[in-house]
């Protein structure tokens, strides 16, 4: 949610800011703006809508220092007045901010009586506060910023510019992601390494409650009391080809197509030269020491946890419970005596999950993060990390990260099970089975045209739809329904097929689309009974089945894969269903309304 870019040094700041904001579009936003300094001249430009609209307003705007921002409204409507950057009372100071300031109304009442505000955002309160301390109390910019930071409560990433000193950007963070990008003759600030990958692949982390003074030729990290902190840089494993669409019309389609490659990358990452599964021994021991695994996640990652639950339990001999991070952050249930928390997050920045992780660390509960982003907050703050190796996922609707999460957890389950002498784990040839999954996905992807025709007939004009399944297929139905509703805006729900008769079947009427998933030979006939029930009430049914349970009347037939991995192959046609349904409704596949890729506020 939201994005920050900033640059100071020997550069064309306007171009870098616009290009950086374009790279952050995937995070979600409703307005954007930049502030550019060139000596005594400065330019503040804002726009509601896409970055292209902002870019069109920046002709002639030049400078070597600047900050930019994409805003996803939390306080105040999406208007130019509420768009960032924001200025102080005298307009000397300019600030961009990601996060939520919890005590902004208290600050306004206690410190800012008589100040005039152009918008309704908490960010404007913050920059006015900094300006007050610098201009009314005579503090230096650095001391004014520090004093404000000691007062402000909440989650934030700040980038501050003093229009009287174009040689420096001041930044600070707490519970919201922010990085320093290191260039030659210039340095940068960004919410995400992808924003600056065209300029550098060298980055420096900022930890919570740290303040950084960024100049063209230096970066100084301090805590809020002024104590200097040493910080090494790291190299981001990204290149421009990772973040471009290539010949694809949408990132989502590109990322769907990348899933076979992701499966093979995971095999390479978690096997040795002899083809044996290799997972960090410390992670294996952490699972062995636990008497219960608690998976904490949100959205698609939560569904990936459900899809992995049976596999983890059967191969590790450890009970697994699922928790929604946003619920656990405000009250944990009664835990077992030796819990292990596994956090699943594509971005590694999910604020709700981090809230739980902070509490887990305070309680001394060991934790593992499964994420796509090395160096992310959840990765840094958990005891252990497993990476997805899926490459950047730009589309808001997650596809390849979901399948990679299940595959990564399969490697974990296999490694722990083998270490425990679990017979099922020893017999589970994961490398071979995951190779079959990759081939199955490729086969499904070769049938795009057929799937598109069926989807158009079924969903082009509908307002409601249902997915049904049993066992693992029910968990896939949950993810499939989320994918369809979040980008096509079709009201869709995923149900356990056996629950239809307990209430949901009342919603079935003539023409209601019902998509049924069938992969389990033990359960398939029961689901087919439910299909007959909804068909008898007028539903239009589309069936997706694996070959081992398929019938001639099924619409989409998939290669049979190992039951533990069937959610990976079964979900792919449902991703295409969502993609084509959205495409034929004339909607933006990659950027659905009201959604952000990385949810960094609670």
UniProtKB/Swiss-Prot annotation:
MF terms (GO), sorted A to Z: carbohydrate derivative binding; glutamine-fructose-6-phosphate transaminase (isomerizing) activity
From the UniProt entry, list the residue stretches annotated as the region Disordered: 67-87
The signal peptide, as residue positions, is none
Q: Which UniProt keywords apply?
A: Aminotransferase, Cytoplasm, Glutamine amidotransferase, Repeat, Transferase
Residue ranges constituting the Glutamine amidotransferase type-2 domain according to the UniProt record: 2-217
The record, for InterPro entries, names: GATase_2_dom, GFAT, GFAT_N, GlmS/AgaS_SIS, GlmS/FrlB_SIS, Ntn_hydrolases_N, SIS_dom, SIS_dom_sf
Q: Which PANTHER family match?
A: GLUCOSAMINE--FRUCTOSE-6-PHOSPHATE AMINOTRANSFERASE, ISOMERIZING, GLUTAMINE--FRUCTOSE-6-PHOSPHATE TRANSAMINASE (ISOMERIZING)
Specify the protein name. Glutamine--fructose-6-phosphate aminotransferase [isomerizing]
Q: Which organism is it from?
A: Streptococcus pneumoniae serotype 4 (strain ATCC BAA-334 / TIGR4)
């Amino acid at each position: 949610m939201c994005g920050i870019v900033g640059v100071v040094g020997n550069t064309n700041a306007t171009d870098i800011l616009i290009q950086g904001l374009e790279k952050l579009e995937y995070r979600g936003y409703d307005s954007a703006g930049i502030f550019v300094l060139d000596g005594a001249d400065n330019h503040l430009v804002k726009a509601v809508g896409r970055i292209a609209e902002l870019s069109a307003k920046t002709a002639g705007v030049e400078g070597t220092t600047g900050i930019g921002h994409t805003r996803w409204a939390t306080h105040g409507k999406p208007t130019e007045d509420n768009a960032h950057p924001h200025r102080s009372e005298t307009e000397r100071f300019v600030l961009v901010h990601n996060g939520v300031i919890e005590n902004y109304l208290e600050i306004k009442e206690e410190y800012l009586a008589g100040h005039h505000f152009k918008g309704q955002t908490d960010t404007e309160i913050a920059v006015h506060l900094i300006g007050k301390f610098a201009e009314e109390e005579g503090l230096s910019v650095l001391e004014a910023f520090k004093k404000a930071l000691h007062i402000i409560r909440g989650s934030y990433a700040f980038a501050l510019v003093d229009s009287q000193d174009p040689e420096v950007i001041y930044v600070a963070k707490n519970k919201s992601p922010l990085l320093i990008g290191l260039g030659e003759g210039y340095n940068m600030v960004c919410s995400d390494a992808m924003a600056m990958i065209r300029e550098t692949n060298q980055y420096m982390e900022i930890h919570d409650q740290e303040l950084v003074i960024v100049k063209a030729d230096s970066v100084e990290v301090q805590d809020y009391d002024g104590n200097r902190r040493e910080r090494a840089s790291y190299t981001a494993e990204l290149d421009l080809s990772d973040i471009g669409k290539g010949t694809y019309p949408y990132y989502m389609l590109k990322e769907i197509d990348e899933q076979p490659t992701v499966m093979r990358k995971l095999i390479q990452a978690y096997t040795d030269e002899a083809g044996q599964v290799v997972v960090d021994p410390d992670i294996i021991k952490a699972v062995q020491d636990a008497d219960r695994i608690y998976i904490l996640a949100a959205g698609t990652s939560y569904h990936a946890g459900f899809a992995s639950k049976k596999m983890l339990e059967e191969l590790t001999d450890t009970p697994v419970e699922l928790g929604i991070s946003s619920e656990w952050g405000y009250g944990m249930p009664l835990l077992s005596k030796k819990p292990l928390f596994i956090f699943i997050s594509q971005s590694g920045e999910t604020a709700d999950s981090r809230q739980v992780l902070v509490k887990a660390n305070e309680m001394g509960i060991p934790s593992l993060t499964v994420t796509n982003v090395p160096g992310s907050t959840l990765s840094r703050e958990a005891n252990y990390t497993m990476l997805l190796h899926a490459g950047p996922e730009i589309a808001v609707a997650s596809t390849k990260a979901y399948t990679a999460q299940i595959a990564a957890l399969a490697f974990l389950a296999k490694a722990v099970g083998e270490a425990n002498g679990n017979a099922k784990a020893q017999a589970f040839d994961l490398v071979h089975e995951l190779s079959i999954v990759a081939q199955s996905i490729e086969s499904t992807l070769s049938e795009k045209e057929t799937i598109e025709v069926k989807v158009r007939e079924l969903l082009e004009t509908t307002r409601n739809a249902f997915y049904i399944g049993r066992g693992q297929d029910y968990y896939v139905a949950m993810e499939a329904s989320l994918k369809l509703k979040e980008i096509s805006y079709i009201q869709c729900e995923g149900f356990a097929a056996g629950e239809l008769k307990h209430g949901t079947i009342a919603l079935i009427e003539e023409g209601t689309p019902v998509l049924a998933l069938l992969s389990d030979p033990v359960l398939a006939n029961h689901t087919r009974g439910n299909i007959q029930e909804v068909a008898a009430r007028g539903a239009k049914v589309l069936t997706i089945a694996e070959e081992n349970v398929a019938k001639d009347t099924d619409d989409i037939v998939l290669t049979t894969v190992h039951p533990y991995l069937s959610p990976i192959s079964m979900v792919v046609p449902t991703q295409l269903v969502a993609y084509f349904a959205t495409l034929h409704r004339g909607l933006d596949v990659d950027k659905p309304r009201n959604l952000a890729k990385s949810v960094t506020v609670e």
